[in-house]
Amino acid sequence: MAKMMMLQQHQPSFSLLTSSLSDFNGAKLHLQVQYKRKVHQPKGALYVSASSEKKILIMGGTRFIGLFLSRILVKEGHQVTLFTRGKSPIAKQLPGESDQDFADFSSKILHLKGDRKDYDFVKSSLSAEGFDVVYDINGREAEEVEPILEALPKLEQYIYCSSAGVYLKSDILPHCEEDAVDPKSRHKGKLETESLLQSKGVNWTSIRPVYIYGPLNYNPVEEWFFHRLKAGRPIPVPNSGIQISQLGHVKDLATAFLNVLGNEKASREIFNISGEKYVTFDGLAKACAKAGGFPEPEIVHYNPKEFDFGKKKAFPFRDQHFFASVEKAKHVLGWKPEFDLVEGLTDSYNLDFGRGTFRKEADFTTDDMILSKKLVLQ
């Protein structure tokens, strides 16, 4: 099959105290993480190298994280190319984005069309372009990264989107960057990629988000709650509902990705990125209701072991405590999230679900199974 390299320029077509826990009812548990060296930097400071614009490649960039990251990078004056299969438009207006901002972005963003699993094409096309920096947003396996490194021997920095899902389940939380990882995790490919980057001696940085939310989220995180709130239905929550989790806004994640660009302190380092506060499952249901202007919801607790849901997922979060410290990113990078949880959920609701847009249709099949059994754990 003939391979084509397309580099196109598109024209316009048309946002709990530090490491704290909150159950949304005001109770807070402080879990401080100490660092020997504290670096004080002004809020919002960026550490981009003195040399002006960078020629940046984003692997992916048309689904969620890359949509916001690419705009920040373009506004900072960098030449940005998205490497995608071309199944989604490279330039589409974001909710809340002004016509002028969209026009500016569309006139500057570039596109390299191809399949990253076609390694020969990746090597030939990237070698011809000679990028300074790679942001790998959609990489899952180490074998997908090696051809990129081979094609770009003079690469200045490889910035990788990993996952906090790589950590080994533990009774001691929050997860910190030096914690044990799980080689059997479903994210083991990301662990192997981090190991590959380290072994190749390149200048790399890895970002480990927890749960990401925000407008255009393709994972049913906040959307799952919004569907039920809009329908006036009870919210089924597994077990006690006091399981502690953590969400980070996509715009704060994009800012963290920018903060590591050209930053010597980020060289060969891993950073957890998410919100500063932790939240219980019950608290998250209440926060989503507040964000969308809904009444406080009825929460129904159930025992998942009493049901056979088949392949359907009855709840969008892992049924366990799962949260990570972002202290390293705050102290080393000078990064700080802009959004608290309710503010971020409000931003997501107003710019997405509240406008009648969502990624997946509501499916209350598992809810009905739970509610019909009326099994409530006190």
Curated annotation (Swiss-Prot):
GO annotation, biological process: cellular response to water deprivation; chloroplast organization; circadian rhythm; monosaccharide metabolic process; plastid translation; polysaccharide catabolic process; positive regulation of DNA-templated transcription; positive regulation of translation
The listed locations are: Plastid, Chloroplast, Plastoglobule; Plastid, Chloroplast; Cytoplasm
Q: What does this protein do?
A: Binds and cleaves RNA, particularly in stem-loops. Associates with pre-ribosomal particles in chloroplasts, and participates in chloroplast ribosomal RNA metabolism, probably during the final steps of 23S rRNA maturation. May enhance transcription by the plastid-encoded polymerase and translation in plastid via the stabilization of ribosome assembly intermediates. Required for chloroplast integrity. Involved in the regulation of the circadian system. Involved in the regulation of heteroglycans and monosaccharide mobilization.
* Gene3D superfamilies, alphabetized: NAD(P)-binding Rossmann-like Domain
Q: Which family does it belong to?
A: Belongs to the NAD(P)-dependent epimerase/dehydratase family.
**Name of the protein described by the UniProt record:** Chloroplast stem-loop binding protein of 41 kDa b, chloroplastic
Per the record, the major location class is: plastid
Q: Where does this protein come from, organism-wise?
A: Arabidopsis thaliana (Mouse-ear cress)
Triggers of expression: Expressed with a circadian rhythm showing a peak during the end of the day (under long day conditions). Repressed during senescence and upon water stress. Accumulates at wounding sites. Altered expression of both oscillator and output genes.
What are the Phosphoserine sites (modified residues) in this protein?
240
Q: In which tissues is it expressed?
A: Highly expressed in seedlings, particularly in photosynthetically active organs. Mostly expressed in young and mature leaves, and, to a lower extent, in flowers. Low expression in etiolated seedlings compared to green seedlings.
